[in-house]
């Protein structure tokens, strides 16, 4: 059980039987009266966001969430199949549950799948993934302006900006939190 004073960005709790995560948080203490906690919440099932103000003394139930490492197998008709590496059970997530992770998701990637009351509701990619560049314009020597980048298409079809020295066919490390190039990977 959480108290209003426990509210922080990233905290997960239940309201009316649905899991919510705090996206943004502000604390206000007026000169008189109770402290106010203004929160921007995201419903972890529907993805809907809204603002809500809580008062000190409000209480919340902890969300009964579980995380399992699961391996991505394939996609079929807008559904993505993941397999538990221990029990070999398969779970399907819809495109709305996978979200932007679809841009960096390739076969056999181990992800953390989030469950609420036994039902898969979302996933988190590892912090870094290695993907191959399948299309990139050649680099002309002399085009070395500081901080220059060029577009490159990854094996998943997602386009990112890479330094000019990265060529087609090379393996690159991508930060999944920012969807940005980190470094080349030696094979």
Swiss-Prot record:
Main location: cytoplasm
SUPFAM superfamilies (UniProt xref): Nucleic acid-binding proteins, Translation proteins SH3-like domain
GO molecular function: translation elongation factor activity
Database matches in Pfam families: EFP, EFP_N, Elong-fact-P_C
UniProt GO cellular component terms: cytoplasm
Location of this chain's protein in the cell: Cytoplasm
Pathway entry: Protein biosynthesis; polypeptide chain elongation
Swiss-Prot/TrEMBL GO biological process terms: peptide biosynthetic process
Keywords, sorted A to Z: Cytoplasm, Elongation factor, Protein biosynthesis
Family the UniProt entry places it in: Belongs to the elongation factor P family.
PANTHER family: ELONGATION FACTOR P, ELONGATION FACTOR P (EF-P) FAMILY PROTEIN
UniProt-recorded name of the protein: Elongation factor P
Organism name: Desulforapulum autotrophicum (strain ATCC 43914 / DSM 3382 / VKM B-1955 / HRM2)
Gene this chain is encoded by: efp
């Amino acid at each position: 059980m959480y108290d209003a004073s426990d509210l922080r960005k990233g905290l997960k709790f239940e309201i009316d039987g649905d899991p919510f995560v705090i996206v943004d948080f502000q604390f206000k203490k007026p000169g008189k009266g109770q402290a106010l906690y203004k929160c921007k919440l995201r419903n972890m099932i529907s993805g809907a966001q809204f603002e809500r103000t809580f008062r000190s003394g409000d209480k919340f139930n902890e969300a009964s969430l579980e995380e399992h490492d699961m391996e991505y197998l394939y996609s079929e008709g807008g559904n993505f199949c993941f397999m538990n590496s221990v029990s070999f059970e398969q779970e399907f997530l819809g495109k709305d549950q996978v979200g932007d992770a679809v841009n960096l998701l390739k076969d056999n990637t181990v992800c953390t799948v989030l469950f609420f009351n036994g039902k898969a509701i979302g996933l988190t990619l590892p912090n870094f993934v290695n993907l191959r560049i399948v299309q990139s314009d050649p680099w002309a020597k002399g085009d070395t302006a500081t901080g220059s980048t060029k577009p490159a298409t990854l094996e998943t079809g997602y386009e990112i900006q890479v330094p000019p020295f990265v060529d087609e066919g090379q393996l690159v490390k991508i930060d999944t939190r920012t969807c940005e190039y980190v470094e080349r990977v030696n094979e």
